[in-house]
C-alpha cells in the first residue's frame, strides 16, 4: 500500500491523517493572545474597520496553515480536488491494483514448455473470483499465475456452496482447485474445525497440508495434519489449540473424533482427494462412519482421475445435486511419452543401467510390485554407482517422511517405490518414470505415469515388459485409449526435457 499520500495537517480535520499532534496545538495556542486579553479586545473593538482587519488576519493565518500541508503528486486545480484526493487515496490505489502486487515476493517464473492439459483455459484470472486480498497474495507467491482448466471449473462452483464431483488428469492443478475455495470460506475468527481434507496416504496428507499453509500464509488460518504412524498424544494436544482446517487420513481422524477431541459439528466442508481410493474397501467403512459426525448442511468436494462404480454409489447416497466436472476426454497426460522394452526378467537390471546411462534424468521414480523387490532393486542400483532412495508402506513413518522430503528437495536423483507413491505426489523435477514391474491394473498404470509431466510439463514413461506382461500391457492400452510404443535406440531429449 502506498504510504506517501497527502494528509490533513497533523491534528486538523477528520481525514485519514495521523492522530492529533499535541506539539502542533501547543505552538498554535502560543500564537493566540491570552484569554483575558482577547475579551478586552472584543469589548473594545467596536470599530468596523478594525473588525475587518481582524478577519483578514485570521484568513491569512488559515491560508498559511493550509500551505504547510504536504503536497500530493501532480497539480490539483483547486482545494476541493486536493481534499478529495487526500481522503480517498486507497480507493485509487486499489482501483489499479498495482501497489499490492508490487510488494509480492514471486518465485522465478517457470519457463518450461506446457501442454494444453493446463494451458487450454478460458482466460480467467484468480482476481475474477473476488478472493480475499491476503489469499491472492499467497496464491501468487506460491507460483500460481493463472487458473488451470480444473481450477476454472471448480473454484467458482465451490464458492457457491454446491457439491462437486470433479474428474481431471493427474498433475493438472486439482489440489489448488479445492484448497483455494476452502481457504476462502474459512473464518479465522471462529476457532472451530470448519473444513476437512481427506487423502488416502500419509505422504499426500503432508504435501496437501503444506500447500494449504503456503497459500494461507497471510491469513490467520490454522492448518493441522494428522495421519497414522505418528504420535496420537501430540495430535490430541494440538487439537486443544485452535484448528480451522484439518488434513489427514480417515482412520486417524475417526480415531480422534471417537475420543471426543476432534469436534466436527461445525465442519461444513469435506474434501475427498483421490476419492476413488478413499472409497475402496480399505477406507470406505471409516469414511462412512466419519461422515456421521458432520453437520447436515455439509458440502462435498470430490476429486480424482478415475471414478469407478463405488464413487457413483457414494455420490447417490450423500451428494445433493452435485455439479459434475469431467475434463478427461483423454486419460493419459499429453506431455508424457510412453515406451515399452521387451526384456527377460534376468535382463531388467542391465536394461535399467542402460536407461540410466542414455537418458537425461532430472529425477526418476522406479516402480516395483512388492516391498521385497523395492529393497532389492534399490540395493542393485546403489551397487551400479547411482544415488538411490527407496520407500514403501512397511517402513517406519519417521523414515518415510525423511525420505519423502529429502527426495522432494533434490537430495537424491532416483527413488524406488511401490504403488504407495502413485497417489497425488507432486514433485515437479521428476521427468522420468520407469515401471520396473508392469502394474497389475490400468488404473495403477495411469497414476504411475502421472508422476512425470506434472502441471503440463513434458515427461517420459518406460515400461520393462516380460513375456507374461504382454496381455496386461495390451489391456491397459485398450482401457486407457492410449498407445505405448516400442522404445527406439535413441530417445530425443526434446520430448521429455524441455
Curated annotation (Swiss-Prot):
A motif (Q motif) lies at residues 124-152. GO terms for cellular component: cytoplasmic ribonucleoprotein granule; P-body. It catalyses: ATP + H2O = ADP + phosphate + H(+). Its EC number is 3.6.4.13. Keywords: ATP-binding, Cytoplasm, Helicase, Hydrolase, mRNA processing, mRNA transport, Nucleotide-binding, Phosphoprotein, RNA-binding, Translation regulation, Transport. ATP-dependent RNA helicase involved in mRNA turnover, and more specifically in mRNA decapping. This is DEAD-box ATP-dependent RNA helicase 12. The gene is RH12.
Amino acid at each position: 500500500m502506498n504510504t506517501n499520500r497527502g494528509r490533513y495537517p497533523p491534528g486538523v480535520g477528520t481525514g485519514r491523517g495521523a492522530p492529533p499532534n499535541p506539539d502542533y496545538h501547543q505552538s498554535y495556542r502560543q500564537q493566540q493572545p491570552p484569554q483575558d486579553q482577547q475579551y478586552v479586545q472584543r469589548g473594545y473593538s467596536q470599530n468596523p474597520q478594525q473588525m475587518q482587519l481582524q478577519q483578514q488576519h485570521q484568513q491569512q493565518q488559515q491560508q498559511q496553515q493550509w500551505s504547510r500541508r504536504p503536497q500530493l503528486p501532480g497539480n490539483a486545480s483547486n482545494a476541493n480536488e486536493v481534499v478529495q484526493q487526500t481522503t480517498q487515496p486507497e480507493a485509487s490505489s486499489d482501483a489499479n491494483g498495482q501497489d499490492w502486487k508490487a510488494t509480492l515476493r514471486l518465485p522465478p517464473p517457470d519457463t518450461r514448455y506446457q501442454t494444453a492439459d493446463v494451458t487450454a483455459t478460458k482466460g480467467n484470472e484468480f482476481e475474477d473470483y473476488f478472493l480475499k486480498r491476503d489469499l491472492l497474495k499467497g496464491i501468487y507467491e506460491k507460483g500460481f499465475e493463472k487458473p488451470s482448466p480444473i481450477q476454472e471449473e471448480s473454484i467458482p462452483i465451490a464458492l457457491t456452496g454446491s457439491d462437486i464431483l470433479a474428474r481431471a488428469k493427474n498433475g493438472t492443478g486439482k489440489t489448488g482447485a479445492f484448497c483455494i475455495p476452502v481457504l476462502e470460506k474459512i473464518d479465522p475468527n471462529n476457532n472451530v474445525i470448519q473444513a476437512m481434507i481427506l487423502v488416502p496416504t500419509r505422504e499426500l496428507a503432508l504435501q496437501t497440508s503444506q500447500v494449504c499453509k503456503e497459500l494461507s500464509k497471510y491469513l490467520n488460518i490454522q492448518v493441522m495434519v494428522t495421519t497414522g504412524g505418528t504420535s496420537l498424544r501430540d495430535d490430541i494436544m494440538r487439537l486443544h489449540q485452535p484448528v480451522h482446517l484439518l488434513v489427514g487420513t480417515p482412520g486417524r481422524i475417526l480415531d480422534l473424533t471417537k475420543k471426543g477431541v476432534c469436534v466436527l459439528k461445525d465442519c461444513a466442508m469435506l474434501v475427498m482427494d483421490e476419492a476413488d481410493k478413499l472409497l475402496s474397501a480399505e477406507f470406505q467403512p471409516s469414511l462412512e462412519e466419519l461422515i456421521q459426525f458432520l453437520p447436515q448442511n455439509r458440502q462435498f468436494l470430490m476429486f480424482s482421475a478415475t471414478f469407478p462404480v463405488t464413487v457413483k454409489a457414494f455420490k447417490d447416497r450423500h451428494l445433493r445435486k452435485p455439479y459434475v466436472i469431467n475434463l478427461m476426454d483423454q486419460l493419459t497426460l499429453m506431455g508424457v511419452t510412453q515406451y515399452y522394452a521387451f526384456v527377460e526378467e534376468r535382463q531388467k537390471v542391465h536394461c535399467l543401467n542402460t536407461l540410466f546411462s542414455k537418458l537425461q534424468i532430472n529425477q526418476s521414480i522406479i516402480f516395483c510390485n512388492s516391498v521385497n523387490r523395492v529393497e532389492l532393486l534399490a540395493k542393485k542400483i546403489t551397487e551400479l554407482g547411482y544415488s538411490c532412495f527407496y520407500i514403501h508402506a512397511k517402513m517406519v513413518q519417521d523414515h518415510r517422511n525423511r525420505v519423502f522430503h529429502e527426495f522432494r528437495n533434490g537430495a537424491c536423483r532416483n527413488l524406488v517405490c511401490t504403488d504407495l507413491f502413485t497417489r497425488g505426489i507432486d514433485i515437479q523435477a521428476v521427468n522420468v518414470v520407469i515401471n520396473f514391474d508392469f502394474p497389475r491394473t490400468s488404473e495403477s498404470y495411469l497414476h504411475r505415469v502421472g508422476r512425470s509431466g506434472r502441471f503440463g510439463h513434458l515427461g517420459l514413461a518406460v515400461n520393462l515388459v516380460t513375456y507374461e506382461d504382454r496381455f496386461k500391457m495390451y489391456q491397459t492400452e485398450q482401457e486407457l485409449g492410449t498407445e505405448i510404443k516400442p522404445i527406439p535406440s535413441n530417445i530425443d531429449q526434446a520430448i521429455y526435457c524441455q
